[in-house]
């Protein structure tokens, strides 16, 4: 997929394969399901009102100028890192801030910390960067290069 399209996906989460028992459960759940009626079997897990309330909470998370700068520095560093051929776009910076808000909410805080940003960075950046051929020949992964990059950026206090 072209880089511009990949950049529109919020995150890349690597799940791996299910255990044998779990795969059997998946097969059993769907083996007699009529594919045309599959969408009817999907259950609502959240009400619109609850979703709006959660979005309102996310909009109330305090994001200091230091956190904004830190997120931007991380993404900007992907554009200058020697092992990265193509770095993250401004869309990556926005995604990093927005997902770090969720990390703060899950930690039951009304403010963002550097740890929220650092935690989300691999999920946000791993599909938005392209490693250099040399880095790939070394066997490096996007996640390893992102961790290396995070260690080079001063964490705000």
Residue ranges and their predicted role:
Residues 1-61, 65-73:
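Conserved AAA+ ATPase core "coupling" helix
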Residues 78-157:
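C-terminal engagement/docking regions of AAA+ P-loop ATPases
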């Amino acid at each position: 997929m072209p880089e511009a399209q990949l950049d529109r996906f919020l995150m890349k989460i690597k799940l791996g394969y299910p255990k044998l028992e779990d795969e059997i459960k998946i097969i059993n759940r769907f083996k007699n399901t009529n594919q045309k009626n599959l969408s009817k079997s999907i259950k609502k897990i959240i009400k619109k009102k609850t979703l709006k309330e959660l979005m309102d909470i996310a909009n109330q998370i305090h994001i200091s100028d230091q956190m904004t700068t830190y997120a931007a520095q991380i993404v900007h560093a992907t554009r200058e890192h020697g092992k990265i051929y193509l770095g993250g776009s401004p869309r990556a910076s926005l995604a990093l801030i927005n997902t770090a808000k969720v990390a703060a909410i899950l930690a039951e805080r009304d403010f963002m910390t550097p740890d929220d940003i650092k935690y989300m960075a691999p999920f946000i950046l791993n599909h938005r960067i392209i490693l250099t051929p040399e880095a790939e020949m070394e066997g490096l992964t996007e996640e390893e290069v992102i961790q290396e990059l995070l260690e080079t950026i001063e964490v705000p206090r």
